[in-house]
Amino acid sequence: MGFGRGCETTAVPLLVAVAALLVGTAGHLYPGEVCPGMDIRNNLTRLHELENCSVIEGHLQILLMFKTRPEDFRDLSFPKLIMITDYLLLFRVYGLESLKDLFPNLTVIRGSRLFFNYALVIFEMVHLKELGLYNLMNITRGSVRIEKNNELCYLATIDWSRILDSVEDNYIVLNKDDNEECGDVCPGTAKGKTNCPATVINGQFVERCWTHSHCQKVCPTICKSHGCTAEGLCCHKECLGNCSEPDDPTKCVACRNFYLDGQCVETCPPPYYHFQDWRCVNFSFCQDLHFKCRNSRKPGCHQYVIHNNKCIPECPSGYTMNSSNLMCTPCLGPCPKVCQILEGEKTIDSVTSAQELRGCTVINGSLIINIRGGNNLAAELEANLGLIEEISGFLKIRRSYALVSLSFFRKLHLIRGETLEIGNYSFYALDNQNLRQLWDWSKHNLTITQGKLFFHYNPKLCLSEIHKMEEVSGTKGRQERNDIALKTNGDQASCENELLKFSFIRTSFDKILLRWEPYWPPDFRDLLGFMLFYKEAPYQNVTEFDGQDACGSNSWTVVDIDPPQRSNDPKSQTPSHPGWLMRGLKPWTQYAIFVKTLVTFSDERRTYGAKSDIIYVQTDATNPSVPLDPISVSNSSSQIILKWKPPSDPNGNITHYLVYWERQAEDSELFELDYCLKGLKLPSRTWSPPFESDDSQKHNQSEYDDSASECCSCPKTDSQILKELEESSFRKTFEDYLHNVVFVPRPSRKRRSLEEVGNVTATTLTLPDFPNVSSTIVPTSQEEHRPFEKVVNKESLVISGLRHFTGYRIELQACNQDSPDERCSVAAYVSARTMPEAKADDIVGPVTHEIFENNVVHLMWQEPKEPNGLIVLYEVSYRRYGDEELHLCVSRKHFALERGCRLRGLSPGNYSVRVRATSLAGNGSWTEPTYFYVTDYLDVPSNIAKIIIGPLIFVFLFSVVIGSIYLFLRKRQPDGPMGPLYASSNPEYLSASDVFPSSVYVPDEWEVPREKITLLRELGQGSFGMVYEGNAKDIIKGEAETRVAVKTVNESASLRERIEFLNEASVMKGFTCHHVVRLLGVVSKGQPTLVVMELMAHGDLKSHLRSLRPDAENNPGRPPPTLQEMIQMTAEIADGMAYLNAKKFVHRDLAARNCMVAHDFTVKIGDFGMTRDIYETDYYRKGGKGLLPVRWMSPESLKDGVFTASSDMWSFGVVLWEITSLAEQPYQGLSNEQVLKFVMDGGYLDPPDNCPERLTDLMRMCWQFNPKMRPTFLEIVNLLKDDLHPSFPEVSFFYSEENKAPESEELEMEFEDMENVPLDRSSHCQREEAGGREGGSSLSIKRTYDEHIPYTHMNGGKKNGRVLTLPRSNPS
């Protein structure tokens, strides 16, 4: 286990102990290990190394896995991984669909080292559907690059500004999300709930989530980037990401600055040092890294030093290390590194000893090179000794059998000779068996100030090389006769070489065939063979001994070749030419090549040999790499402009490009889904705007001549140019990755004529089969999807003759030879969609209609012949003269069944209708209005009507006059014989007493003899009189005596009040729901009139809640309700209201005061009016009208006097607020007039302090401004059913047989009764599919306001269902 980027692959074994020490002190902050950076590619084997990692100190790259499948990742999860210190890169990992299970707890990416300025890179992940990093809270440094992921969604739902400090440099393009094809649905959205936090980006208030099941965690703004707990409490300022407890530096998930001994700190205190920008280490830790790396022979690790309170890999520029304390000290002027040889001379006998002089520029002393073996010696010696410029003493090369050349001293230019070897030698070379070259004297200068040269027993070093050194170094004439041995230097080398000449050279893209002239020494048996040397040489400046040593390290590739067979025929004059076929070469690459002989050595005669000059040969061209950066855009409805850049590896001279294109069919899912339903986002497709460049202006010149002459593109700024350079560098890096994979070029195709492109004409798309449907839609033929091809000699192409608003798949190949056997690259793919046709979505012809009985109108129209993509729905707009315009959504499937739409339940009158289609490109034009007249299906012939209409008009006028007189007298005598007028909380519950005050109550089976009722004690004052607790005999079957509540009427009550009292009791005779207070009987004979009700032992809910306050005087000793108890209350009230809703009753006055609490604490809907006098302050008289509970009323009820089940749902939300606040006054601090204005302007209550999030979400659902967006009471129960008491299913309406609706549930109503009924403005076109009746003119009110979801894509607003951003109340 290594630490630090520099040691991630080379010093791993050295640092296991250090890592173990760190893990031992990690505490609970990091439960696993600190692992080095990882590069995981090709397969999943190394991925298991992440199993125990909490921190990756370095980067994590997962890439190039082409055989993996989704099931391979299903059991892989690394929940311990919390932080990556550098960057995370994913590239071409097949089968990986989400990271939510792979890295479920990844919280921080620090970005200490970036990948081209990016800390998170997701590139060409072909199967990735979502990121899923739902615990990712901070990317401390760097940006995000997410590019070319064709299936990746849930990008628009991520608020990156909550994760990064700046989002300006993020590069998120060419993903599926860009095309608006993603139906991103955050948790709860499909069920109408708002579970995820919403934030504002670019003026849009959007929910934030990572997946359909994981919200993005958004901490309060005050927490900044410190993170917060699950409850939303801010973490300590030193935390990063999240924490388990607030304001505690030991409970952080990760540290903002540095980690030390189980807690987060701002800086490392002495004696600790900063390490890798995230943790603190002591001096011993840094020292161990330094010496273990220095003693290691493995390259790449760093000898860590101390600088500015940091443990860093090496001293910065301008500093040098003090070896005594590992501190970096500044240089004076340029920073030479003078190395003092303490004993006067230093022997270099290994790479390790050479590393001690790494970075030295001046040697104060002498060097002795005595290296007999080692790996990669030439490179290692050059890395460690290559900076030496000056030696003050002497240089001695002795018995260094591994050396071939001294070129590793590449900067040595001065040997002072202040200290000389015995015999006054400043350069000494003895017994170096393989030394063949000193330096390349054409490029190297060396001065020896004093002293002589000594050369003995260097058998392969020619004397000519030694004499050249004498001339260059200025030592010629200093040497004596025995200083340079004439017989032991060069005696085994071919110093008197003949020149070999190549006689034949032939090349291919990966081979070179060579032949050269034959060579034979005087004794042909001395020739052992030939040695062929070659290497890549971009430039023709190569020398023979570059990078060579005698231990095998050699920058040249060497091939041993046997000598040719020598003919035994002495007359033969044509000896065969030796040669070699070089294989495995790179195409279109220049190679340096030379050949020399290998001969035996003889003491008895001179050694002969031969060697060629270095020649340069280039291999042939072959298939190029893929073209770079293909971009496709559309500039019209029939054209696509394609641009690209040349391939990075042309492997020859690019001669032309091949472009193939093929029309793509639309997703089959689009044909099947009903986009009028709730939760389905309307699909759309987009096309890219044309290029804003000179070329594109040329393409569009005929179409945009005026604009082109007036506008020109602005010059790019330096920052834009820098950005493009960075992006280009990024793309080239990934091109290197592509070369790790062997691509197979496309099989050659038969060329097609370009004229065939003209046959790609606009056609309609295929419609899936619907039963009993006669469709005029023409199926798309296979011929129309055939591919087309064009040869292009430049780096752009305009493809014409395409179908409007249609997707095309385009393949692009680069070729570097124009011949029958083309050399072309693997294809680069790009997709594009043509622009829409302006009138293609317009409906052809007029809208026709047919009127049936029962006020049913069948509308019919023709589908657009060639729409933009395909039609997904139709919008029908109709209105009756004098009324508002109504809109109806007709799905594609519904239109296919009906060839139009049926309007049902229309009121008599003149109507106008118009229709428009919505395609993938948007809305078409409205048709011309069609007019029709709907008559009353009860109309009689006109001659009879004339006889009837006259008397009716007379009766109507007479009624108006009588009514006016009656109202006048009432105003003059408000306390007349009828008594004062009380506003009923539920006018629907009244009989005709308001219209016929003389009506009389008729006793029925509910009548109870007065003698069976015994009054015990007073319970409280009701709206009509006192309410008592009593006993009733034989009132419930099987019970001899029952405790009951008895309501009475005051003796002074008027006749109207007594009738209203009995009629309210009559209404309750029809209620048999466990969660509605039950009527047990009526005593109407005699005085006073009694109504016997089920006894609710704990009174009304408002009083009960207030009694549970800890400081309440009447507290019965019970604690405040728990969350479970509040959910139980909520469900019981919702179940009772659902029952009333099913009975077609609107409550109008739902509040805690009108809910009652039974002896077992079951909450039930109260007896509709009992509490009016008791809580009179909760009501408000508006404009001289009746008393109104304005603090519980919905906006539409306050504004228009409209009361529906949806307005009851608003009141239900206020009841939830009362439950969670223990019955505080809603909008406390605001007057009734202020509340009325506040609510009508879109305001609603803030949740109470410490309100459970689940109940807060329910409240906000109830307080949607648009009534149609509020849930139903049945939906509320359905949301809570899993958390209710086991007895709930046995007694509730929700689980009862009565809740199972019949096939059609409609209600006959008079037109005058429609005022208080929630009308379905969408008509019944869609309802017909659900089994509604076709006949009859009755008006259905069965939850149409909930089931028909408004289509928010059509000019949203309050009237069609957009959820608006509402102002929040601030009662305080």
From Swiss-Prot:
Intracellular or extracellular location(s): Cell membrane; Recycling endosome membrane; Late endosome; Lysosome
Annotated transmembrane regions: 947-967
GO molecular function: amyloid-beta binding; ATP binding; GTP binding; insulin binding; insulin receptor activity; insulin receptor substrate binding; insulin-like growth factor I binding; insulin-like growth factor II binding
Biological process terms in GO annotation: adrenal gland development; animal organ morphogenesis; cellular response to growth factor stimulus; epidermis development; exocrine pancreas development; G protein-coupled receptor signaling pathway; glucose homeostasis; heart morphogenesis
Covalent cross-link Glycyl lysine isopeptide (Lys-Gly) (interchain with G-Cter in ubiquitin) as placed by the record, residue numbers: K1069
One Pfam family this sequence matches: Furin-like
Protein name as it appears in the record: Insulin receptor
Disulfide bond positions: C35-C53, C153-C182, C186-C209, C196-C215, C219-C228, C223-C234, C235-C243, C239-C252, C255-C264, C268-C280, C286-C311, C293-C301, C315-C328, C331-C335, C339-C360, C462-C495, C676-C889, C815-C824
The protein's Enzyme Commission number: 2.7.10.1
Location of the active site: D1149 (proton donor/acceptor)
Catalytic activity: L-tyrosyl-[protein] + ATP = O-phospho-L-tyrosyl-[protein] + ADP + H(+)
Disordered: region residues: 688-709, 1349-1372
Ranges where the record places region Important for interaction with IRS1, SHC1 and STAT5B: 986-989
Gene that this polypeptide is encoded by: Insr
Binding-site list for ATP: S1023, K1047, E1094, L1095, M1096, A1097, H1098, G1099, D1100, R1153, N1154, D1167
GO CC list: caveola; insulin receptor complex; late endosome; lysosome; membrane; nuclear envelope; nuclear lumen; plasma membrane
Documented activity regulation: Activated in response to insulin. Autophosphorylation activates the kinase activity. PTPN1, PTPRE and PTPRF dephosphorylate important tyrosine residues, thereby reducing INSR activity. Inhibited by ENPP1. GRB10 and GRB14 inhibit the catalytic activity of the INSR, they block access of substrates to the activated receptor. SOCS1 and SOCS3 act as negative regulators of INSR activity, they bind to the activated INRS and interfere with the phosphorylation of INSR substrates. Interacts with PTPRF.
